[in-house]
């Protein structure tokens, strides 16, 4: 989230700093393979269950920062693959602008309503009576929502005297004003590029930093170019 210090922003800044440093030092692209180890040192992962997973994710962030596409998860390739084609004087970004690193995604559950342990199993059963679909029943003295029947109207949440029902939202999905975020068969976020306008709201709202964008000029310390004017990607690099 914006204006709040977080680990995602720290990693993002470190990736951009290293890519910018690489460019200003003359572009020794053999160093690219070492960058994930410099950004994530040591033997133990700090943010995720494995240091190898952290480095793999950072590697994809490095590629996107340099204007390179994500690598297929099912194929072996070097981190630097394709860098020669990208390191040219004139280059416009290759779509898509917003990408999902699938193995960085937490596969959050879709937006739904959930009964917490704050439920008192009251006699009034306001939530049950408020539900227009009969999706709420009582089990072991507590309310339970049948997700197959629930239409996510939120009436049960409003009716509960104990605020025991919460709306669980998938941050990226909730932030998208175009309803362009879905999920694949593994529950990972996926973007419908026919709807996506590349606003970046999903990017800044993903707590796991799984959604990233191509930011070649920003990574090199250059300002964004005016949308209404033609300019080269390399303008101002000298």
Model-inferred region functions:
Residues 1-175, 179-185, 209, 215-235:
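Ferredoxin-type iron-sulfur electron-transfer modules and their immediate structural context
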Residues 200-209:
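Conserved glycine-bearing catalytic or ligand-binding loops at nucleotide- and phosphate-handling centers
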């Amino acid at each position: 989230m914006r204006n709040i210090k977080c680990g995602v922003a720290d990693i993002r800044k470190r990736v951009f700093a290293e890519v910018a440093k690489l460019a200003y030092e003359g572009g020794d692209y053999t160093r690219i393979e070492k960058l994930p180890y410099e950004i994530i040192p040591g033997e133990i992962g700090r943010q995720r269950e494995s240091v190898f997973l952290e480095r793999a994710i950072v590697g994809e962030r490095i590629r996107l920062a340099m204007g390179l596409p994500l690598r297929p998860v099912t194929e072996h390739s070097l981190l630097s693959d394709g860098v020669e084609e990208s390191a040219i004087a004139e280059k416009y970004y290759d779509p898509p602008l917003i990408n999902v690193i699938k193995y960085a995604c937490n596969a959050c559950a879709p937006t739904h309503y959930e009964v917490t342990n704050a439920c008192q199993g009251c006699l009034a059963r306001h939530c049950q009576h408020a539900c227009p679909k009969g999706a709420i029943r009582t089990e072991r003295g507590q309310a339970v929502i049948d997700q197959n029947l629930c239409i996510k109207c939120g009436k049960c949440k409003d009716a509960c005297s104990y605020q025991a029902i919460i709306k669980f939202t998938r941050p990226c999905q909730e932030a998208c004003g175009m309803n362009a975020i879905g999920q694949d068969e593994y529950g990972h976020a996926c973007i419908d590029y026919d709807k996506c306008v590349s606003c970046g709201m999903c990017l800044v709202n993903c707590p796991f930093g799984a959604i990233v964008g191509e930011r070649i000029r920003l990574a090199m310390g250059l300002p964004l170019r005016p949308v209404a004017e033609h300019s080269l990607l390399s303008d101002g690099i000298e």
